[in-house]
Structures are given as C-alpha cells and as structure tokens.
Design a protein with these regions (language model features):
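Short "lid" loop at the C-terminus of a central beta-strand within the Rossmann-like core
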Residues: 20, 83-86, 92
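Conserved serine/cysteine hydrolase catalytic core
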Residues: 109-177
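Conserved hydrolase catalytic core segment
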Residues: 50-87
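Conserved catalytic-core motifs of eukaryotic protein kinase domains, centered on the activation segment
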Residues: 24-30, 89-90
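Conserved HGGG/HGGXW glycine-rich cap/lid loop of the alpha/beta-hydrolase fold
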Residues: 1-23
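Conserved acidic catalytic loop of the alpha/beta-hydrolase fold
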Residues: 35-52
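A catalytic-pocket lid/entrance helix-loop region that shapes and gates access to the active site
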Residues: 90-118
Length: 177
C-alpha cells in the first residue's frame, strides 16, 4: 500500500530497512554509522538503477550523502522530517557508556538507536555532499528540503545553491519529469 503523501509519484516505490532496522540484519555489538547505512542504500541503488530518494529523519541525511556520492544515479534527494534528523550535533561530545533499552519487537536494534543518536553531523561535511551533487548531477535542483526542523547541518544545506525548500508533493512532481 502506497502512503498518501507519496501517491503523486508515477513510478515504483521501494522502501529500505537499514542495517539494524526492521527486517534487516543486526550486527553483533553495534558498529553503526550513517556511512554504513549509506552503504545499504548504495547497494539498493546498484540493484535498482537510477532513483529519486525520499528520506525521512535519519534517512534524509543518508539520502543527502548518497546524492553527493552517486550524483549520476540519484535523480533527486528529498529530505523530510522524522526521527533521527538531528543526529548527535555538529561536533563530537564526551562519550558515555549507556546501557541500551531492551529490544522491543519491530524497533531498531538498541545499539543503532544509541550510536546513531550520537552521530556527528558537521554542516561543512553535509554541504560538501550538496556541492558534489550540484556539480555532477544533470539536475538543476538535485536536493529538495521538505523538513521543517533545521538542525545545523540542514540549515547549512538550505543555503547552498542547488538545494530548494519545497513541499514533498512539489519535490516529487519536480523529479517525476
């Protein structure tokens, strides 16, 4: 069943369970990073071919990185609000030893929640992927920001040429052309 918010999309819709989330594999003892999740999405991209990416929360950051890393294959990245959007902030903090909550059915691996909540997201790192996408993509607007929340990395992204603030429906209509 296709969610109503993406019903304007004319093509197939695929969903990805990142490592440690949903029905995907769970690595023993954690070891999660956004770049590991980007590798999951990159493997899907290699199998499916050129795609428009819609990422919610943590998935928005992954979509941005993949748009910069594979600008010829990503036919637009749409960044939306959702859990994990902010990450761990723009700089590292003192590590703490925290016992993750007990695993709940259908919830992400507790280590994923813990490690990805601390994932550092410097604005200049994020904007380097925007610039790469803009320079190498054939699209006039390879990044669309639909998120209302503006963590530091996303506030920097919206200031870059080639990134547009728009609604989800407008972004999907734009990339469907």
């Amino acid at each position: 069943m296709v969610p109503e918010r993406v019903a304007v999309w004319p093509g197939p819709i695929w969903a990805l369970d990142f490592t440690g989330h949903g029905a995907s594999s769970v690595p023993l003892g954690g070891g999660y990073s956004v770049e590991i999740l980007m590798a999951d999405a990159d493997a899907a991209l290699a199998q499916l071919g050129s795609l428009t990416l819609v990422g919610h929360g943590l998935g928005a950051y992954v979509a941005l990185l993949l748009a910069g890393a594979r600008p010829q294959q990503v036919r637009g990245a749409v960044l939306c609000d959702g859990p994990g959007l902010a990450g761990g902030g723009p700089r590292p903090v003192t590590p703490a030893v925290v016992r993750p909550v007990e695993k709940l059915e259908q919830a992400p691996d507790p280590f994923a929640l813990l490690e990805l909540a601390r994932d550092v997201r410097p604005p200049d790192y994020a904007t380097s992927f925007v610039r790469q996408a803009c320079q190498l993509s054939e699209l006039d607007r390879p990044i669309s920001v639909c998120a209302i929340e503006r963590p530091d990395w996303l506030a920097a992204v919206v200031e870059e040429p080639g990134a547009a603030v728009t609604t989800l429906a407008e972004a999907l209509s734009h990339y469907a052309r």
